[in-house]
Amino acid sequence: MIRIALLGCGEHSRISHATPLARYAALNPGVIELVAACDLELTRAQEFCNQFGFARAYSDAESMLSKEQVDGCVCVMPMNSIVSMAIMLLERKIPCAFEKPLGISSAEAEKLGLVARETQTAHMVSVNRRFMPFLTEAKSWATAIGPIQYIRATQVRHGRNERDFIWSTAIHALDALRHIGGEIISFDADVYRQAELSTLWYGVSIRFENGTRGRLEVMPTAGMVEESYELLGEGFRAQVLAGSGPQRSLRCWQNGELKLEKTSSETEAEDLRNGAYEEVVEFVRALKTGTPPRPSVEDILPSARICFAISESATRQVEASA
């Protein structure tokens, strides 16, 4: 069996990593073994063992990795520890999956990219929008009809006034646009900083290499939680309500008619709706076949570069208007 360990047992790890790992183990007997869970708070790791079936609990990563034979490691760290822990795993040649963002600065992201290229260790970045079932279906449906001419992503949140939002969270939506539209050749970021707003809002116009145009709208303090994607072309439109919102839906129109409509049930497990389970499927597939999982740091680095550039531009705009 493939032996998988988990580093980090916080709430996000519970929902987006431990839950789908346990689901995969239950649905595919004899394929993976959840050998260990590790957290600085040992009681958390022990709780993961009891709830999700990890065999042993640790409070120290070094101890876990020296005692366990690990075929793959899922690493879920606070933002300021993502790069150091990811580099440790890459340099140990341990196939791994780790969370976005790729560090807390552009320099950290570039350092992680360099180590990934130098070590050539199999790894995967967790950006679940690339695996979200409704968004995947929308992309396939629209692409089958004709070239996508315009893509829009809108990320709405409530009370998210942290200054790092554009590169720590909005990277999800920006990366989803790249996943659908391809490489971005230029972008123009407009920063909204009104007296009534507690933080920055963003509007980003995008040009893709293939000629497609796009738009990213980020409103972190708009009073509710929703994330939407629209894929448009001559005679068709696909709309996905996704992300962390309460309603998940897919609607596709062609030539004035609604051709496809799906809505997920609130009783459906979150990891099946948000792409987390499909991420596990991809990681295990790669471990089974000995092939690199996707997406890699190299795949996500362009998204990180753009988000950090938008953040730096926003800082300059705010300083200039002060």
Feature annotation, model-predicted:
Residues M1-F52:
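N-terminal Rossmann-like dinucleotide-binding module
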Residues L6, G72-M77, F283-A322:
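C-terminal helix-rich "cap/oligomerization" subdomain common to oxidoreductases
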Residues E41, F52-L114:
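Beta-loop-alpha module in the N-terminal Rossmann-like domain of NAD(P)-dependent dehydrogenases
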Residues F98, H123-V125, V240:
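Hydrophobic residues in well-ordered beta-strands that form the structural core
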Residues G103-R160:
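A contiguous active-site-proximal alpha/beta segment in oxidoreductase catalytic domains
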Residues S126-P133, Q155-F187, L200, D299-I300:
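Mid-domain beta-loop-alpha active-site segment that forms a flexible
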Residues N128, E230-E298, E319-A322:
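C-terminal glycine/acidic-rich active-site capping loop/insertion
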Residues S168-Q247, Y277-T291:
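Contiguous beta-strand/loop segments that form the cofactor/metal-binding neighborhood of enzyme cores
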